[in-house]
Amino acid sequence: MNKVVVYVLALSILLFFGLPNTTLARVQYGSPVSRKEIGKGVWDQKVFNEIKIAVGGSDSVRAHSKDHKSNPNG
């Protein structure tokens, strides 16, 4: 019985000390009207596609060995 009381007391203390920390750690989202540049920091699908195009393929031996399937373990 004493262990249960200690566990509940410890969890409640952690809960009450943890709540202000999570409140402070939240990301504050501003409305687009309040920002100076609307769209700044917004990543749309076009930006992701440009990044995918800019990144080349892998030149590693492991990547090429999977295409040939000569090694059943690789």
UniProtKB/Swiss-Prot annotation:
Its family remark reads: Belongs to the serine rich endogenous peptide (SCOOP) phytocytokine family.
Q: Provide the tissue specificity.
A: Mostly expressed in roots, and, to a lower extent, in seedlings shoots.
Per the entry, what this protein does is: Brassicaceae-specific phytocytokine (plant endogenous peptide released into the apoplast) perceived by MIK2 in a BAK1/SERK3 and SERK4 coreceptors-dependent manner, that modulates various physiological and antimicrobial processes including growth prevention and reactive oxygen species (ROS) response regulation. Inhibits root growth.
Q: Which domain of life is it from?
A: Eukaryota
**Chief subcellular location:** membrane
UniProt keyword list: Apoplast, Cell membrane, Cleavage on pair of basic residues, Membrane, Secreted, Signal
Record's subcellular location: Cell membrane; Secreted, Extracellular space, Apoplast
Protein name (Swiss-Prot/TrEMBL): Serine rich endogenous peptide 23
What does the annotation say about its assembly with partners?
Interacts with MIK2 (via extracellular leucine-rich repeat domain); this interaction triggers the formation of complex between MIK2 and the BAK1/SERK3 and SERK4 coreceptors, and subsequent BAK1 activation by phosphorylation.
Q: What Gene Ontology cellular-component terms does the record carry?
A: apoplast; plasma membrane
Lineage of the native species? Eukaryota, Viridiplantae, Streptophyta, Embryophyta, Tracheophyta
Signal peptide feature range: 1-25
Motif SxS motif essential for MIK2 binding location, chain numbering:
58-60
* Location of the motif SCOOP motif: 52-66
Molecular function per GO = LRR domain binding; receptor serine/threonine kinase binding
